[in-house]
Design a protein with these regions (language model features):
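Oxidoreductase cofactor-interface core, primarily capturing Rossmann-like NAD(P)-dependent enzymes
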Residues: 1-90, 99-108, 151
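A hydrophobic C-terminal alpha-helical subdomain
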Residues: 60, 96-157
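Conserved residues in the N-terminal Rossmann fold of short-chain dehydrogenase/reductase
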Residues: 93
Length: 157
């Protein structure tokens, strides 16, 4: 049995992917996703979905589950962050090449990951139907709910 996850929204808290102030003082999130949707999920919901798989017993043996809480563009994520944080957050779209060149540990791997997500958006999001995750975890959070619970934990750079 396989559970295929999505981008962890917790990366905004723990991995330095939260909004950063630009030269004009306005916050922005930077992703190489152009106008493509990114499947995302709260880390705690991954565990709850896996628990749902286990609760299903032998009926779930050998199955593959793709899970996500929501599929959002970078602009939609920025709008949700703006609402949750009470200050403007822009979406800064960069190319995968630019992202890989940022020079932090893992930038190349993340750039490759995001490039795959963007270039194969329909495949990636289609393999993560929201109703499947919600069936496994009836408490599944969408991005707005995640932000309502965690906005104060997101470091603003």
């Amino acid at each position: 049995t396989l559970v295929n996850t999505s981008f962890y929204w917790d990366n905004l808290i723990h991995f330095g992917m939260g909004p950063k102030k630009g030269p004009d003082g306005v916050l922005a999130i930077t992703l190489p996703m152009a106008d493509k949707r990114l499947s995302g999920i709260a880390a705690e919901d991954i565990g709850k979905c896996v628990y749902g798989v286990f609760k299903g017993g032998v009926a779930n043996v050998g199955k593959t589950y793709g899970i996500a809480g929501e599929h959002l563009t970078g602009a939609q994520m920025a709008a949700a962050l703006t609402k949750a944080l009470g200050q403007t957050v822009r979406y800064n779209a960069v190319t995968p090449e630019q992202f890989r060149g940022f020079g932090f540990p893992g930038a190349e791997d993340l750039g490759n990951m995001f490039q795959f997500y963007a270039e194969f958006e329909d495949y990636f999001t289609g393999a993560r139907p929201l109703d499947v995750a919600r069936r496994l975890n009836p408490e599944l959070q969408d991005f707005a709910t995640f932000l309502a619970r965690n906005a104060g934990r997101i470091p603003l750079g």
